[in-house]
Amino acid sequence: MTLLASISTIGNVKSISKSNNFSSLSNSSLQSSNSIQCGGCGGGNSLIGTVGGLVGGVLVGTGIIVGTVIGTVNGVVGGLLSGPSCGCH
């Protein structure tokens, strides 16, 4: 019975671990799309915001919050370079 209980416990730990990974991926996607919304409005500047958003999403997925700041700053810079009507929305 003890061996069976141990195997059951190991199975539960794996299940929890998979749930946490899925959770991280979901947060990564959400952070990515939020950062992309901060991109510039036209020209090459929108690419700056998009790249910043993707980098931000990947870093948040690994547990580093700084990635979101990088994506947001790139989006704001792209918005400022494009004109006053652009920026984070």
Curated annotation (Swiss-Prot):
GO biological process entries: sorocarp development
The family this protein is said to belong to: Belongs to the hssA/B family.
Disulfide partners: none
Lineage top rank: taxon: Eukaryota
Protein name: HssA/B-like protein 14
InterPro entries from the UniProt entry: HssA/B-related
